[in-house]
């Protein structure tokens, strides 16, 4: 970071303990490795027998090797603790990650809104062409004073002020279309109990 932040006392103490652990573990590895190298050196004169000295050197090398392994494991644990410390306390990085994710979601929402608007316009154009074809055909029995479905649709859309208003249900429009279709296919009543179609003079 370009600017060093002022840490609370507890965090400062924790970082100091991490630094001390790092130095102690590295020193332990270096000292034990140095002693292992010294033990490997063959000396000419011994106060004890050569077999006894060999067993002693073997035991010392095992102990110092175990110390090196233990210091290495402590360093790995220190790395894990440092990662956890950064994750839990590096708030600027966390906030930056959150802001980037929010920006990605906003971009995705804008793209979805544009696609929905384009889909709405395509549906409206197709609906207008279908209505023009239907009302100009000889099968239309609708009242000329009735509004076409496309005009009803656009009247509804003219009241929408945001992309969220695209969720207006089309059920009333479809119900009106089904009513018009039923008027075409419903035969006149011939039993005298219902009103038939008006005869043309």
From Swiss-Prot:
Protein name (Swiss-Prot/TrEMBL): Mediator of RNA polymerase II transcription subunit 22
Pfam families in alphabetical order? Med22
Localization, per the record, is: Nucleus
Q: What PANTHER family does this protein's entry cite?
A: MEDIATOR OF RNA POLYMERASE II TRANSCRIPTION SUBUNIT 22 (PTHR12434:SF6)
Segments carrying the region annotation (Disordered) are 182-201
Q: Between which residues do disulfide bridges form?
A: none
* InterPro entries named among the record's database cross-references: Med22
> Its biological function?
Component of the Mediator complex, a coactivator involved in the regulated transcription of nearly all RNA polymerase II-dependent genes. Mediator functions as a bridge to convey information from gene-specific regulatory proteins to the basal RNA polymerase II transcription machinery. Mediator is recruited to promoters by direct interactions with regulatory proteins and serves as a scaffold for the assembly of a functional preinitiation complex with RNA polymerase II and the general transcription factors.
Q: Could you tell me the keywords of this UniProt record?
A: Activator, Coiled coil, Nucleus, Transcription, Transcription regulation
The similarity comment for this entry is: Belongs to the Mediator complex subunit 22 family.
Keyword Isomerase in record: no
Recorded GO CC terms? mediator complex
Name the coiled-coil region(s): 93-123
Domain of life of the native organism: Eukaryota
Q: ATP-binding: present as a keyword of the record?
A: no
Q: What is its main location?
A: nucleus
Query: Single Gene Ontology BP term?
Result: regulation of transcription by RNA polymerase II
């Amino acid at each position: 970071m370009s600017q060093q932040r002022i840490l609370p006392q507890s965090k400062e103490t924790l970082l100091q303990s991490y630094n001390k652990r790092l130095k102690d573990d590295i020193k332990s590895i270096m000292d034990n490795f140095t002693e292992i190298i010294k033990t490997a050196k063959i000396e000419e004169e011994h106060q004890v027998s050569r077999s006894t000295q060999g067993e002693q050197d073997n035991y010392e090398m095992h102990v110092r090797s175990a110390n090196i392994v233990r210091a290495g494991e402590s360093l790995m644990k220190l790395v894990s603790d440092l990662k956890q410390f950064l994750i839990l306390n590096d708030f600027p990085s966390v906030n930056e990650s959150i802001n980037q994710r929010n920006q990605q979601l906003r971009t995705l929402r804008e793209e979805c809104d544009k696609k929905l608007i384009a889909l709405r316009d395509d549906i409206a154009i197709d609906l207008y062409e279908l209505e023009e074809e239907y009302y100009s055909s000889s099968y239309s029995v609708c009242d000329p004073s009735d509004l076409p479905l496309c005009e009803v649709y656009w009247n509804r859309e003219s009241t929408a002020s945001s992309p969220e208003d695209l969720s207006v249900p089309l059920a009333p429009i479809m119900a009106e279309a089904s009513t018009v279709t039923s008027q075409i296919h419903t035969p006149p009543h011939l039993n005298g109990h219902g009103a038939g179609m008006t005869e043309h003079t």
